[in-house]
């Protein structure tokens, strides 16, 4: 499946139905009063978040969505039928922007969350509405109003608690396949992963936590070089990052600093996101090499360093225990943080 995480579309609410001019025409009532009904309301275009979609691919083929118009009013003061709403499913994590104002209209995070993106127009008033002491037989009515029209940009930001970051070939896809049921494409060359891979990892309690392997992070990613500019924003929703460093790289320290620099350059607080620093591929180097790199890293960071082999499974139990501990601490801090609205 092709992964599409950005789309531009047009949406339009339905037009309100017209009010009508009509008079009572009953037997024995030769001069009946006004009886023109109001028009029905136009339908609205409504987004509904769903967990059954993981991409905005559908919007590559359909870019215009319109709700039904309201029906015109009827005689005998009958109001026209309302137009049907146009319901559009979008993935959880979709952010909706108005392209004309560049304002965020909404952020659809939870399943079944709804957002009206184009309201339907009001129905026009029939001549019955204009009856007054001064005008006992109004011969005019109002047309329905046009529905709201909008040009939208949709951006999908993956909903994952834990993001796995690192340079290409650091072993991110191998790690996510080792700890979850995800089966991403894996090969021994850079840029194997061209889309974010999601995997659900089970806690000891049985609850699932979503991990995301974030691809495309290279030097200059925040400027749009490589794939990074498209994927850095997926990190924004994560609560915890696993920073994977391959010990078979020519310069693991430079690799680490490149990623840290890209997070800082992108901004939005990514450089302050909680991280677990992990040496990967310890099965491919000797103990002396591991020890030397631990000493070198200790000079540039105070972070605790975990060591794993995503291939053999060495150290994965310790890593996951650390992840659960960190997430629990983050939840405790968030619970203790006073709300601005309390």
Swiss-Prot record:
Keywords: Cytoplasm, GTP-binding, Hydrolase, Magnesium, Metal-binding, Nucleotide-binding. Mg(2+) binds at residues 173, 193. The keyword Magnesium applies. Residues 160-328 form the OBG-type G domain. Residues 1-159 form the Obg domain. The keyword Heme does not apply. Pfam families: GTP1_OBG (PF01018), MMR_HSR1 (PF01926). It is found in: Cytoplasm. One of its GO terms (cellular component) is cytoplasm. It is an enzyme of class 3 (hydrolase). GO terms for biological process: ribosome biogenesis. Belongs to the TRAFAC class OBG-HflX-like GTPase superfamily. OBG GTPase family. Monomer. This is GTPase Obg. It comes from Microcystis aeruginosa (strain NIES-843 / IAM M-2473). The gene is obg.
């Amino acid at each position: 499946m092709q992964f599409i995480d950005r789309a531009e579309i047009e949406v339009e609410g339905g037009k309100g139905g017209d009010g009508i001019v009509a008079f009572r025409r009953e037997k024995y009532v030769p001069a009946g009063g006004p009886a023109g009904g109001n028009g029905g309301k136009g339908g609205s275009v409504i987004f509904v978040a769903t967990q059954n979609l993981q991409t905005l691919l559908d919007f590559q083929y359909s870019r215009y969505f319109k709700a039904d118009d309201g029906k015109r009013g009827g005689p005998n003061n009958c109001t026209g039928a309302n137009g049907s709403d146009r319901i559009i499913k979008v993935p959880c994590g979709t952010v909706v922007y108005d392209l004309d104002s560049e304002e965020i209209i909404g952020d659809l995070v939870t399943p079944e969350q709804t957002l009206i993106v184009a309201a339907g127009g009001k129905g026009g008033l029939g001549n019955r509405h204009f009856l007054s002491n001064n005008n006992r037989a109004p011969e005019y009515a109002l047309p329905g109003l046009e529905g709201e029209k909008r040009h939208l940009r949709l951006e999908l930001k993956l909903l994952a608690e834990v993001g796995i970051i690192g340079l290409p070939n650091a072993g991110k896809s191998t790690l996510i396949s080792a700890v979850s049921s995800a089966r991403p494409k894996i090969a021994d060359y850079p840029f194997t992963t061209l889309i974010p891979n999601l995997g659900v990892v089970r806690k000891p309690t049985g609850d699932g936590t979503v991990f995301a392997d974030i691809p495309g992070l290279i030097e200059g990613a925040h400027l749009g070089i490589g794939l990074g500019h498209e994927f850095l924003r997926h990190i924004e929703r994560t609560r915890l990052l696993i920073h994977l460093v391959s010990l078979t790289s020519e310069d693991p320290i430079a690799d680490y600093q490149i990623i840290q620099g890209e997070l800082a350059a992108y901004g939005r607080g990514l450089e302050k996101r909680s991280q677990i620093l992990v040496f990967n591929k310890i099965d491919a180097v000797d103990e002396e090499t591991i020890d030397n790199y631990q000493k070198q890293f200790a000079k540039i960071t105070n972070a605790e360093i975990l060591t794993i082999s995503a291939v053999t499974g060495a150290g994965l139990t310790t890593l996951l225990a650390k992840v659960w501990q960190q997430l629990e601490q983050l939840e405790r801090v968030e619970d203790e943080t006073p709300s601005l609205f309390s």
